[in-house]
């Protein structure tokens, strides 16, 4: 029986990646690094989960002396804090709406008595800001559990953040469905034993989502009865 829907945040609930990219570049300028992550480069970097991890990976690709790389690595936490501040300011200034079909699915889920949860690699501050600007005036859509990347030891594709959500919900994976937009997210959800629906964005449309239980262009294509059927069929075939 379906009891909860667990959503990734960035790219799944809202297409926030361009805003993240702009925030990274603005943070780099504040640190006088003059790096510039183009849309193409950022698409490649999205294969690395987590903002701090993404910056560290990028530093590892630079043609720089070992001492300079070490200096830059030490700056990563501060750069990321600055990026988070800029990102939340950008969200507050220009509302980043949910993707098509998301708000309707959230309302339908609550009307059906289902619980809502978030499992994201982003920071708690980013989650809180995005939900606040999108759910103002709709307290009935409150999420029962929220797990973020800064609360677990290993980020996606490790299942830690999903396992934390399941513990918070006090539910087994067999009664929940996860929603993702990336291969790392899909792997994390499947490793936690969850039936998973994928809705890619332009940032990850070329990734291999063959392991997903359902692959959609938009959450406009799904409703609660279809999700209940998907969960039942997946566990019957297991």
Segments predicted by a language model, with ranges:
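N-terminal helical cap/lid subdomain that shapes the substrate entry/recognition surface
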Residues: 1-9, 13-100, 107, 111-112
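Asp-based, Mg2+/Mn2+-dependent phosphohydrolase catalytic module
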Residues: 1-2, 107, 123-125, 129-238
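Small-residue-rich anion-binding loops in enzyme active sites
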Residues: 112, 116-118, 124-125
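Residue-level signature of catalytic and energy-coupling elements of molecular machines
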Residues: 24, 83, 120, 158, ...
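Structured helix-beta-strand junction loops
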Residues: 93, 112-113, 149, 211
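Conserved SAM-binding loop
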Residues: 13, 116-119, 178
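Residues at secondary-structure transition points
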Residues: 70, 74, 78, 93-100, ...
């Amino acid at each position: 029986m379906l009891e909860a829907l667990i959503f990734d945040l960035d790219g799944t609930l809202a297409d926030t990646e361009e805003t993240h990219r702009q925030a990274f570049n603005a943070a780099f300028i504040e640190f006088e690094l003059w790096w510039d992550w183009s849309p193409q480069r950022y698409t490649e970097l999205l294969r690395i989960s987590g903002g701090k991890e993404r910056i560290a990976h990028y530093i590892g690709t630079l043609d720089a002396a070992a001492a300079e790389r070490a200096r830059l690595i030490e700056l990563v936490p501060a750069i990321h804090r600055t990026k988070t501040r800029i990102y939340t300011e950008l969200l507050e200034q220009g509302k980043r709406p949910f993707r098509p079909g998301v708000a309707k699915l959230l309302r339908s889920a609550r009307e059906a008595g289902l619980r809502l949860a978030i499992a994201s690699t982003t920071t708690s501050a980013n989650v809180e800001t995005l939900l606040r600007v999108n759910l103002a005036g709709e307290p009935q859509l409150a999420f029962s559990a929220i797990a973020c990347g800064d609360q677990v030891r290993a980020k996606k594709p490790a299942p830690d953040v999903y396992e934390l959500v399941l513990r918070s919900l006090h539910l087994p994976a067999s009664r929940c469905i996860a929603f993702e937009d990336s291969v790392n997210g899909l792997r994390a959800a499947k490793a936690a034993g969850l039936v998973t629906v994928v809705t890619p964005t332009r940032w990850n449309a070329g990734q291999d989502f063959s392991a997903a239980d359902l692959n959609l262009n938009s959450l406009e294509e799904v409703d609660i009865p279809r999700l209940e059927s998907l969960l039942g069929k997946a566990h019957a075939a297991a």
